[in-house]
Amino acid sequence: MAKLDKEQVIDDALILLNEVGIEGLTTRNVAQKIGVEQPTLYWHVKNKRALLDALAETILQKHHHHVLPLPNETWQDFLRNNAKSFRQALLMYRDGGKIHAGTRPSESQFETSEQQLQFLCDAGFSLSQAVYALSSIAHFTLGSVLETQEHQESQKEREKVETDTVAYPPLLTQAVAIMDSDNGDAAFLFVLDVMISGLETVLKSAK
């Protein structure tokens, strides 16, 4: 077998994540999937927490592409596009939201975070406002992903069990259909635009 490297460990762990979810993911079964003894894995990931942190970082590196503003992009468009890209990256993998929850920027992400803050400060926000804007939208996006993925998992369980049809009132019937129609995309964009509109008000009131 060729020499094991961390990239292979993470790639195989991501495949396994889609198969078993975060609860079923262990360093033991990652080692089994790769075909090595568990102690060999410890050269690259010391424990499950280190494995999850590495997975979170890799998911963003591979799939979160709109991390910095494009030339002439407005701060509103950047926040919107950044959040959409972040959400899409987390939805690429089973339990992607849970994998990311609780993490902080790694050293490789420091410069990106610095440039994001500087961009918002240059747009007129104070540093604290820039921090709150970025963190609030990130937390909302993560919450949206967690809710979407939990709904997907619970829906799979419901489909395994025969249940009686529930008779909803007319408006609630339509509301359920709306919420189930597009994986939560429209609801996410609606609230995201509300948040950005609120930030526009904050910026205007500061002038």
Curated annotation (Swiss-Prot):
DNA-binding region(s), residue ranges: 26-45
Domain of life the protein comes from: Bacteria
Alphabetized UniProt keyword annotations: Antibiotic resistance, DNA-binding, Magnesium, Metal-binding, Plasmid, Repressor, Transcription, Transcription regulation
Keyword Metal-binding tagged: yes
Residue stretches making up the HTH tetR-type domain: 3-63
Induction: By the [Mg-tetracycline]+ complex.
Keyword Glycosyltransferase on entry: no
GO biological process entries: negative regulation of DNA-templated transcription; response to antibiotic
Residues that, per the record, bind tetracycline: H64, N82
Pfam family name, one: TetR_N
InterPro entries cross-referenced by the UniProt entry: DNA-bd_HTH_TetR-type_CS (IPR023772), Homeodomain-like_sf (IPR009057), HTH-type_TetR-like_transc_reg (IPR050109), HTH_TetR (IPR001647), Repressor_TetR_C (IPR004111), Tet_transcr_reg_TetR (IPR003012), Tet_transcr_reg_TetR-rel_C_sf (IPR036271)
GO molecular function, one term: metal ion binding
Binding residue positions for Mg(2+): H100
Reported function: TetR is the repressor of the tetracycline resistance element; its N-terminal region forms a helix-turn-helix structure and binds DNA. Binding of tetracycline to TetR reduces the repressor affinity for the tetracycline resistance gene (tetA) promoter operator sites.
Family annotation (NCBIfam families): PRK13756.1
Protein name: Tetracycline repressor protein class H
